[in-house]
């Protein structure tokens, strides 16, 4: 699914576990990755064979990475608790809307 964040187009796609491990140079094959975010190519990859509830939580997590990469250019900034709360409050509606659209789109294609 394609979506925009701060006028940048991103893609969410579901992939096999070996693709996630390859992206992390981890060939242990123990099913350790549920998702990852690639800011350089503006893609979020989700492990396709996890339960919907886990996939949803993973997508929220990865979208927070996306939000941080897109809106907050930082490098090793130490956030205060108030900074974290502001980031969470400001990103909440954006991220929840994308997750809702993603799973509504997924449900349309179920047989």
What is each stretch, according to the model?
Residues 1-54, 70-111:
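Metalloprotease/metallohydrolase-associated module, dominated by Zn2+-dependent proteases
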Residues 57-69:
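Active-site recognition of the HExxH zinc-binding catalytic motif
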């Amino acid at each position: 699914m394609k979506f925009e964040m701060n006028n940048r187009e991103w893609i969410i796609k579901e992939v096999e576990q070996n693709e996630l491990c390859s992206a992390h140079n981890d060939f242990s094959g123990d099913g350790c990755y549920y998702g990852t975010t690639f800011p350089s190519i503006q893609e979020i990859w989700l492990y396709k064979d996890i339960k919907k509830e886990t996939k949803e939580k993973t997508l929220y997590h990865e979208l927070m990475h996306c939000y941080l990469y897109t809106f907050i250019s930082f490098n090793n900034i130490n956030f205060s608790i108030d900074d974290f709360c502001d980031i969470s409050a400001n990103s909440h509606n954006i991220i929840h809307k994308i997750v809702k659209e993603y799973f509504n789109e997924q449900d349309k294609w179920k047989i």
